[in-house]
Amino acid sequence: MGHKIHPKSIRLGYIKDWESKWFNLKEMPNFIEEDYRIRVYLKNRLKLASVSKIVIERPGKYLRVSIYTARPGIVIGKGGQGIESLRKEIETMTAKKTFVNIMEIKRPEIDAQLASENIAFQLEKQIAFRRVMKRTIEKAMMSGVQGIKVMVSGRLGGAEIARTEWLKEGRIPLQTFRADIDYGFSEACTPMGHIGVKVWIFKKEFFKKTAKELAEDAKVVVDLDTAAKQG
């Protein structure tokens, strides 16, 4: 089933975290719809800013929106005017006091969502799909990832019949929960129809601490407690 389930959702609570960080059973339907509208609005508003993900938190009656982008200058704007404008627009949508944080993605070539959007952008410019896929894989592997897989589906190259093509390099252990696999999906709107783009990037594995490391951590905690009592 590893090939069928979403690579991020299966790892939530293990090595991945939620992108909507709140819990309210009574208002859950309204909050889910509101989060969706905020994300759609920001993705359309910041098309040129290379936005990878948007994390929404709801501490109390406030709203905290964190925008992860590879081009923070476009979002912030001159003298912070861009971010202030975004804050006011979100407050108008939600009627809640809003805080906006900008998080910079320093290595966009290993971000699966940004990689898929870049492929879709180049496909819309009629660049050969195999060349685009190879370039994306080369850049990611040169950045030190352990594996990458790129898949495109649709009327590739203007063909009459839609088909699926994919390229892969390195390992993509989808069924290994400790594997940090990033996943991204985008669509290219071409004159011949839509082309779907999927990207999987295997960055590293998370291993549990050994008994020796856990014992050392416990010793540090005990030493800190002792020092606090003596102080």
From Swiss-Prot:
GO terms for biological process: translation. It holds the Pfam family Ribosomal_S3_C. CDD domains: KH-II_30S_S3. Keywords: Ribonucleoprotein, Ribosomal protein, RNA-binding, rRNA-binding. PROSITE patterns: KH_TYPE_2 (PS50823), RIBOSOMAL_S3 (PS00548). The keyword Iron does not apply. It comes from the Bacteria. Residues 38-106 form the KH type-2 domain. One of its GO terms (molecular function) is structural constituent of ribosome. The keyword Lyase does not apply. Gene3D superfamilies: 3.30.300.20, Ribosomal protein S3, C-terminal domain. One of its GO terms (cellular component) is cytosolic small ribosomal subunit. Binds the lower part of the 30S subunit head. Binds mRNA in the 70S ribosome, positioning it for translation. Belongs to the universal ribosomal protein uS3 family. Part of the 30S ribosomal subunit. Forms a tight complex with proteins S10 and S14. This is Small ribosomal subunit protein uS3. The lineage of its organism: Bacteria, Pseudomonadati, Elusimicrobiota, Endomicrobiia, Endomicrobiales.
